[in-house]
Design a protein with these regions (language model features):
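Conserved short histidine dyad/triad with adjacent acidic residue
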Residues: 40-55
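Short, surface-exposed charged micro-motifs
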Residues: 40, 60, 128
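A short, N-terminal "cap"/entry segment at the start of jelly-roll beta-barrel domains
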Residues: 1-37, 50, 80-93, 102-110
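Glycine- and acidic-residue-biased ligand/ion/polar-headgroup-sensing regions
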Residues: 56-77, 90-98
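Short hydrophobic/aromatic-rich beta-strand segments that constitute the beta-sheet cores
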Residues: 50, 70-72, 139
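A short beta-strand-loop micro-motif that forms or neighbors metal/cofactor-
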Residues: 64, 130-147
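Conserved metal-binding segment of the jelly-roll/cupin
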Residues: 46, 110-133, 140
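Long cytosolic regulatory regions associated with cyclic-nucleotide signaling
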Residues: 91-102, 116-118, 135
């Protein structure tokens, strides 16, 4: 049996300080055949978590300590046409540039000291995390990890 306690939290935050990514993951799965993702993630301010999504599963996030924002986005896709001098030639070649941007639609503040403990991120939602102070979160998702 494993206990998630203050000693573990302190150790994970210390490891995150030594990690160039300013975060440290702790896998809670119990066997290689486990088909879920359960982990603790120690996150420090200025860590960069790219905007991403999980197409086939919701994600549950519980903040054990610290303060952070889960930020949800809409994906905005546009197509830029070529410059006017090459327009006709490019039209024939279907040479448009696809441009993807993300527009913030929701910000969920997590801070256990303020009784704001967690959130559930919907399947397919684009999201990231912005860390305000050193934090440790519990994350859970269906399915095995795919890099």
């Amino acid at each position: 049996m494993m206990e998630i306690n203050n000693e573990l939290i302190i150790e994970l935050l210390a490891q995150a300080k030594e990690n160039p990514r300013l975060r440290q993951n702790y896998d809670l799965r119990t066997s290689p055949g486990d088909t879920s993702q359960r982990m603790l993630n120690a996150l420090l301010p200025e860590t960069s978590v790219p905007i991403h999504r999980h197409e086939n599963t919701t994600e549950t996030v519980i903040c054990l300590c610290g303060k952070l924002d889960e930020v949800i986005y809409d994906e905005v896709v546009s197509y830029e046409k070529p410059s006017s001098e090459n327009f006709q030639q490019s039209m024939d070649a279907q040479d448009f540039t696809r441009k993807v941007e993300y527009r913030e639609i929701q910000r969920i503040h997590l801070c256990p000291a303020q009784a704001k403990y967690g959130c559930q991120i919907p399947k397919g939602a684009w999201h990231t995390v912005e860390v305000i102070e050193p934090s440790v979160i519990f994350e859970a998702k269906d399915g095995s990890y795919k890099a």
